[in-house]
Amino acid sequence: YLYQTLGFPAPYPDPQENKREVCELNPDCDELADHIGFQEAYRRFYGTA
């Protein structure tokens, strides 16, 4: 895709985005992520990030 107004390619999708969304849907994981960061919060709730 191209940004319509800027004329350059869109950035590559974040490979962690799916895991970030899973963590955001869990209120406890989301709250912990606010304090210690997404990757560490995800690891504590779901295993390896």
UniProtKB/Swiss-Prot annotation:
Binding-site residues for Ca(2+) 3, renumbered to this chain: 24, 30
Superkingdom, natural source: Eukaryota
UniProt-annotated binding residues for Ca(2+) 1: 17
In-chain residues carrying the UniProt-annotated modification 4-carboxyglutamate: 17, 21, 24
Coiled-coil ranges (or none): none
Post-translational modifications reported in the UniProt record: Gamma-carboxyglutamate residues are formed by vitamin K dependent carboxylation by GGCX. These residues are essential for the binding of calcium. Decarboxylation promotes the hormone activity.
Protein keywords: Biomineralization, Calcium, Disulfide bond, Gamma-carboxyglutamic acid, Hormone, Hydroxylation, Metal-binding, Secreted
Residue stretches making up the Gla domain: 1-47
Disulfide bonds: 23-29
Function comment: The carboxylated form is one of the main organic components of the bone matrix, which constitutes 1-2% of the total bone protein: it acts as a negative regulator of bone formation and is required to limit bone formation without impairing bone resorption or mineralization. The carboxylated form binds strongly to apatite and calcium.
Protein name: Osteocalcin
GO biological process, one term: negative regulation of bone development
Organism: Notamacropus eugenii
Binding positions (Ca(2+) 2): 21, 24
GO cellular component terms listed in the entry, alphabetical order: cytoplasm; extracellular region
Family membership noted in the UniProt record: Belongs to the osteocalcin/matrix Gla protein family.
Keyword match tRNA processing: no
Gene for this chain: BGLAP
GO-annotated molecular function: calcium ion binding; hormone activity; hydroxyapatite binding; structural constituent of bone
Compartmental location: Secreted
Sequence positions bearing Hydroxyproline: 9
